Amino acid sequence: MIKLILSLIFLIICCNINPSESFKLITLTTGPTSDLGFNNMVNQGRIGVSKAMNIEDSRIFIVSGRNETYALLLPLIQNDDIDLVICSSQDHGDACKEIAAMYIDSPTIKTQFLVRGSGAATKNLIQITYNYASVNYISGMFAGLQTVKNKIGFLSPGSAANNNDSFVYAFWIGAKQVNPDVKFYYYNIGSYLDQDKTIAATQDLINIYGCDVIADTLDDFSAGNVAIQNNQYAMGTNGFPQRDVYGENVIFSYAYNWTKYFLPIAGSVANGTVPGKWYADFNKEDNYNFYDLSFGFKVSQNTKDLLIQKSRVLATTPRAGHPYYCNEYIEQYTKKYNLPTQAANSSCISTAGFFYINQPVGDMIYLGSYNIRLSKIEFSSSVQKGFSIVSGCLIAFVILMMVGIVYYKDTPSIRSASPIFLNFSLIGGIIIYIGIIIWVGPISTHQCNARFWLVTLGFSTLIGSLVVKNFRIWLIFDNPELKAIKITNYQLFPWVGLCLVINIVLMAILTSVGDLKAIEAQGIDSLGKYEYMTVCKMNSAGASTLYSILAYFAALLLVGVFVSWKIRIVDIEEFNESKAIANTLYAVSFCLFVIVPLMISPQEKQSETIILCVAGLFITTAALLIVFIPKFWRVFIYGKEGTNEMFKQKKSSSVATARAESLSKNSSNGGAHSGGGAVKTNRRGNIVSGDFTDDSESSLSEPNKPTKNNDGNVNVTAGAVLAEFTDDTISEFDENEVNEEPVKTESQE
């Protein structure tokens, strides 16, 4: 009789729904309707109502939280003459209730609000609640029967999402009653919809705890997807008919049928009646049965029959008498936590007490609120090994060159280039290579500072030594007054030291005020949401200091350019390094031409490191090869004789030089008396003969045998100055010439 009456009421309500194009419906969800979960089923209910009532103005909005909901909804209520607002989530409840209270007695705004909950209904506020503890209990029974390992995992929103663990407990007690040996592990996610946490937590339940059955009360199917990816059967326990999508990969699912409740509620609003409060659960009347169960083909018939029979018992039993309200575990729990029990039966928890279950019951294993562990992304080990091996090989090669410098230090090619400064340059290259090895190594605050120190000091040593030793060549050769110049290595060391001191001071400032340190950075490069990378970072003061260091290096290079330009006229290969320095600068410029645009454009940290290290290797190696290969080549070709006959002669003294000049003068006079043309004595420079503007290589004669050029000019050699340049001390006078009288020069005559 009751069944007949309820059916008639439902038919009367549905038949009295007048299709109306003017009825306006708004539905609020907290997530996309494509979530294959709760929001999708709410949308299915909206579509069912819209079709049944021919509603043309049926809108759906994704919104969450009180403030967002209020800001979205209030203008619509005020301006659009909305008939019904379905606030599907408890997230919407506060805002919907506030707006409903604002217009409860409004003569113009007649909007009805459907909210989740079991509170009091008003003239424009409808309450609906559904009991998913009952369907969780049925799902738990299925999981307990299905598990092979007797290990079940579960994910819940938890108290952080205003959700207690009573429904987790309902699932557990269902599994426990059919399988007393089951172990039950569960996480609280902190939200109904957090795919990242859901995926990670599910993976942990499978990999760490060995669960072979996973269930949840979340809005989407992320947990089920992870289970399927791990070759396990999934359970659809979020209200969406997952088996319709995933087929036999989902062995059990239940679906919410919101149309069965939204339709009569919308019909009541359209007819002007106040629906009041609604309660959804298993129901013996199919028109009001909220849950639709679906089983896989591999589920035994006995299991199906047991669960269907149990769901019918729940449908005909008052909620207070359900098994999850009354059992030996909950009786102990109520005593332990002093929760209210039912007046008629103290071994059963009351409805109010049920919603305060937030601690594990019985042997439930609570794993805590899940937080995703950040994954550290390391620098590519293959790149690290590659740069380290290449740098190590180059260090070995440079050490061999240093040995070669020491071994061939007495050859003109090496001696004329100052062996000690050549080795300084090579040491600078080694320091740079070591800096590159550290640059690609594991990042720490010490590493961040060390790599800048090493690379800058190495560069200062390499370039500074080249510039200083070539500066000496310039001073000696650019000497029109024919003065004997004494410039020893000890006089040049302070200048190299000055280059290093400037570098050290700037780096000390960078270290002290730049706050250069290693930090754990997220959201950079292509890192995932829960990935991080350790990078070096400095503040703006440090960046300014770094620019100053780069400016200092630029100035050092410009000085090198100037010096190389000044010694370009020295036509003895051993002394003239202008081409080598120029080629080195070309290599540096080429790298800068490529690097600067790349560094200005957005780069991933690993790509940036690779570019910088490749550039460092190329610049350093190119500079060393350009400067040193020609020297060793001349050693190989010419040996101890050098490229110029001057190196084959006995070292001369300054007196010998004066004698050569006098002889040159006499030869010039003799040539004039014999009728020859006037012969000019070229006195520019005191090592090489000929005009410095002449790019052709000059021929050197013996000290006491001046020679003539094709144009009749008499060349003057000055082996004494060569001796002074190639020795660390001033050149000695020949013993046989010490007591000789000075030769008169032209001015003395």
Swiss-Prot record:
Chain ranges on the Cytoplasmic side, renumbered to this chain: 407-419, 478-492, 566-579, 631-749
Main location, first listed in the record: membrane
GO cellular component labels: plasma membrane
Presence of the UniProt keyword Signal in the record: yes
Residue ranges, compositional bias (Polar residues): 698-716
UniProt keyword annotations, A-Z: G-protein coupled receptor, Glycoprotein, Membrane, Receptor, Signal, Transducer, Transmembrane, Transmembrane helix
Transmembrane segments: 386-406, 420-440, 457-477, 493-513, 545-565, 580-600, 610-630
Keyword NADP attached: no
Annotated region described as Disordered, given as residue ranges: 658-749
Extracellular side: 23-385, 441-456, 514-544, 601-609
GO molecular function, one term: G protein-coupled receptor activity
Comp. bias intervals (Acidic residues): 725-740
Annotated signal sequence range: 1-22
One Pfam short name: 7tm_3
Glycosylation (residues): N67, N164, N257, N271, N345
Membrane topology: Multi-pass membrane protein
PANTHER family: METABOTROPIC GLUTAMATE RECEPTOR-LIKE PROTEIN C-RELATED, METABOTROPIC GLUTAMATE RECEPTOR-LIKE PROTEIN C-RELATED-RELATED
Family under the similarity heading: In the N-terminal section; belongs to the BMP lipoprotein family. In the C-terminal section; belongs to the G-protein coupled receptor 3 family. GABA-B receptor subfamily.
Annotated protein name in UniProt: Metabotropic glutamate receptor-like protein M
Protein source organism: Dictyostelium discoideum
